[in-house]
């Protein structure tokens, strides 16, 4: 099956791909990353600091996994994961644009799975894969819509955290 995974260029998505991609080795996998989650604009200073820290961790992970011959016990960088699936992992922020739709359609996906992808897919994109789109949302819907759902749950003192697969 041709499966396209849409994720974000962050630690949580990297971990998810490290866990998921080895299980999909019998399928043809394509991965596209968004470069952010949420709206474009000024962020609070604390979020800027968190993003800088996370990007430094990703850079360190990339250097570490590229310099070790055996990384079986370590998280693989996005670059190393691209080697695992036999194709580079590219950034695709404008997936709803005609050019983005063409890029997605060229892979002829049977299924699209989104995990923390930073763009809400519009109907023309949703209609492309033969078996549809599955989205993993980081919180229970409809209570925790939007980005950082797990953190909103913790902030509100939720006794349980969850996800929504829809």
Feature annotation, model-predicted:
Residues 1-166:
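One-carbon transfer enzymes
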